[in-house]
Amino acid sequence: MKRLVYFMGGVLVIIVMLGILSVKLSADTGKSTLKNQLTIYNWGDYIDDSLLKKFEKETGYKVNYVTFDSNEAMYTKIKQGGTTYDIAIPSEYMIDKMISENLLVKLDKKKLTGFDNIDKRFIHQSFDPENDYSIPYFWGTVGIVYNDKFVKQAPQHWDDLWSSDYRDNIMLVDGAREVIGMALNAQHDSLNSTDMGKLNLAYNHLKELTPNVKAIVADEIKQYMINNEAAAAVTFSGEAAEMVAENKHLHYMVPSEGSNLWFDNIVIPKTAKNYAAAYAFINFMLEPKNAAQNAEYVGYATPNVKAESLLPAKIRNDKQFYPDNQVIKNLEVYKNLGPDWLGIYNDLFLQFKMYRK
């Protein structure tokens, strides 16, 4: 937004500044004030901006795009009320939680066009069994990015990361479910385990990984790997795709014993005001051409099979990011384990981080 430098006349200053403040407050809170406005609550840079302009041109709706940086921040804002979002894009475990707390609108499927374009493998998931509340937007995995300049033999299993060859050379994503889940999968247990014995074994196994861990970070992983500053990293497939595109020595794989299959889905929050605009946007994003353009821009895998067929061959045939059924069958979606078990996962992860120090 351009900054207005000066005004002519004191009264005009006050009037214009009040107007700017009103518009800014509307954008910051996500509150829809116009019948032709659609307020989208999404992750930053998680849609091709040219698609938003195309949507506005085709439908006449004005898009107000508001961002969040975590599922928890998004959930809190919607649960508190007082703000209105017509569309949101939460992850699967948060959708489960929001459904249970009656925070989402049950979709009228008669108003949907293009739902049949969604890959049958990615519907009827445990967090929304009948897809009554959500439509898949992007999907992906958690796996290992490795650098062939440092790694003698490509990893095949989670336990390969425990090798002394990786001493002080592994980056871990800063997430309790991801890191504890990795340790659970390494011992062939479910990453949704609520068995305290198995969780303690996973924690003890993680402690043995400590000499190999260079850092536990979030977005910084990308630059470390692109700049050849680490041999391997545990991260999300979408982030990995960006790394691989920037450095020819980087590769991504999902361990055969299992990992996380994640989803970000489109939902309509219960506080939505413009249902017509919300359905128009969902249907717009279900169109194969639009979904393909979005997937190519963002770099994440599209669940839209017709859109996938429109992607360049080098993208749709890349098994690193569009794995086959043999890989997918061993993946698990994170379940909403409830606050008590989530607290245990967080505590174990915090203990691991403190143990490293």
Regions found by a protein language model. Give the residues of each.
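Extracytoplasmic ligand-binding site segments that recognize negatively charged/polar headgroups
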Residues: 84, 89-212, 217-229
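Conserved C-terminal helix/tail region of periplasmic/extracytoplasmic solute-binding proteins
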Residues: 325-357
